[in-house]
């Protein structure tokens, strides 16, 4: 029988392996995603972010790092999590269905050249899929953070979008990689803005 200590140690070991595997395929796409966001922000655009559950928390975490700061003081950057307005979420959910809680906001707030960060560990969240479609209608770029095989979201992305797919079957490991990717993108953005890299 496995002890609790062994279970915890196994989590650490699996998390390390999952990050190492993701690092083999996601360094270049992560840089592309950061550059896409930088281009948007330098042209007075904004970043909209969405997801469900833990991915909603990641969307909010990312928006907070942009509007506040990541690790260094810098100007505020325009980013909005579409997961925080309970009145909008419940009104849209009630009147149009939960699948549309993000897409209606994207259509209302998104403009050509803006970026949508859509987060879904399965790649199959219906409301994130609808948000991606709405972003495309608005001539926005999409950065999709997914897991497993990328799901339906990976299939509808355009060549100008960026897929950050964590190739792991376990949701916890995907989520841990998503926050690492978010922090890496924040660091890239700060490095360019503050150090001219």
UniProtKB/Swiss-Prot annotation:
GO molecular-function term, one example from the UniProt record: D-sedoheptulose 7-phosphate isomerase activity
Top-level lineage group: Bacteria
EC number: 5.3.1.28
Disulfide bonding pattern of the chain: none
Cofactor: Zn(2+)
GO biological process, one term: carbohydrate metabolic process
Pathway: Carbohydrate biosynthesis; D-glycero-D-manno-heptose 7-phosphate biosynthesis; D-glycero-alpha-D-manno-heptose 7-phosphate and D-glycero-beta-D-manno-heptose 7-phosphate from sedoheptulose 7-phosphate: step 1/1; Bacterial outer membrane biogenesis; LOS core biosynthesis
Cofactor binding mode and count: Binds 1 zinc ion per subunit.
Additional observations: The reaction produces a racemic mixture of D-glycero-alpha-D-manno-heptose 7-phosphate and D-glycero-beta-D-manno-heptose 7-phosphate.
Subunit architecture: Homotetramer.
Family: Belongs to the SIS family. GmhA subfamily.
The protein's name: Phosphoheptose isomerase
Organism of derivation: Neisseria meningitidis serogroup B (strain ATCC BAA-335 / MC58)
Gene that encodes it: gmhA
């Amino acid at each position: 029988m496995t002890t609790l200590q062994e279970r915890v140690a196994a989590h650490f070991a699996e998390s390390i392996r999952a990050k190492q595997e993701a690092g083999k395929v996601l360094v270049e796409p992560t840089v592309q995603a950061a550059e896409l966001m930088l281009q948007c922000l330098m042209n007075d655009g904004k970043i909209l972010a969405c997801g469900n559950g833990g991915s909603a928390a990641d969307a909010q975490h990312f928006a907070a790092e942009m509007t506040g700061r990541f690790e260094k003081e810098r100007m505020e950057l325009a980013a909005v999590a579409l997961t925080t307005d309970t009145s909008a979420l419940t009104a849209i959910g009630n009147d149009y269905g939960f699948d549309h809680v993000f897409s209606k906001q994207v259509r209302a707030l998104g403009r050509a050249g803006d970026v949508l960060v859509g987060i879904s560990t399965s790649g199959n969240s219906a409301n994130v899929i609808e948000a991606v479609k709405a972003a495309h209608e608005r001539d926005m770029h999409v950065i999709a953070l997914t897991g497993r095989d990328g799901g339906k979201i990976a299939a509808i992305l355009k060549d100008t979008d960026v897929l950050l797919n964590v190739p792991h079957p376990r949701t916890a490991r995907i989520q841990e990689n998503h926050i690492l990717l978010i922090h890496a993108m924040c660091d890239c953005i700060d490095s360019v803005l503050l150090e001219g890299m």
